[in-house]
């Protein structure tokens, strides 16, 4: 199954964003961002059932970007948060995560809310929030996803500032 040019361009943009911050992604065999002749890709490496290409950024935070044919992509952060991001903002969201421009937004308040979170095995019930855009006069866009705590807790996620 061939990889379309938009997906190829997205892989290239992700590679550039990661390289700018010293975190180039793992090689993507089905979409070599530097080989213009590789637009057709490799059917073996591509998830043909869902038509997706995965781009992995090792380190902290650990990021896995799933590029889907329809352009509605997903960024998985530290294996506990999924952000649904349209293709136009994908590289900006990844770059914001790589440089630490993300925040946690508490989803409960007060002693009882936090106690309930602890009892339900989520000691810090919150959403991960990433804001992008707005620099060029356009309205900033916000992407968020629930922080689903799993053992072991992510030190990177827990160290993020909390929104007021």
Which residues does each predicted region cover?
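Residue-level marker of intrinsically disordered, low-complexity segments enriched
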Residues: 1, 37, 51-53, 75, ...
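N-terminal "first-domain core" detector
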Residues: 1-50
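Alpha-helix boundary/N-cap detector
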Residues: 2-5, 9, 81, 85-89, ...
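Acidic, proline/glycine-rich low-complexity IDRs
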Residues: 3, 95-164
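Long, highly charged amphipathic alpha-helices
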Residues: 9-13, 89-96
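Conserved short hydrophobic interaction patches
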Residues: 17, 21, 93-100
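Short linear motifs in intrinsically disordered
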Residues: 41-45, 59-69, 110, 114-121
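Intrinsically disordered, low-complexity regulatory segments enriched in Ser/Thr/Pro
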Residues: 50-89, 136-164
């Amino acid at each position: 199954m061939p990889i379309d040019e938009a997906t190829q361009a997205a892989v290239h943009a992700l590679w550039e964003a990661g390289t700018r911050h010293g975190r180039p992604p793992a090689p993507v065999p089905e979409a070599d961002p530097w080989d213009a002749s590789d637009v057709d890709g490799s059917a073996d490496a591509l998830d043909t059932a869902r038509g997706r290409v995965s781009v992995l950024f090792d380190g902290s935070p650990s990021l896995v970007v799933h590029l889907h044919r329809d352009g509605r992509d997903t960024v998985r952060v530290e294996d506990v948060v999924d952000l649904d991001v349209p293709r136009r903002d994908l590289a900006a969201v990844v770059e914001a995560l790589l440089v630490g421009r993300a925040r946690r937004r508490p989803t409960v308040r007060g002693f009882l809310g936090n106690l309930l979170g602890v009892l339900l095995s989520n000691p810090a019930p919150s959403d991960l929030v990433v804001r992008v855009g707005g620099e060029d006069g356009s309205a900033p866009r916000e992407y968020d996803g629930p922080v689903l705590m799993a053992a072991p807790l992510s030190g990177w996620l827990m160290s993020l500032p909390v929104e007021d």
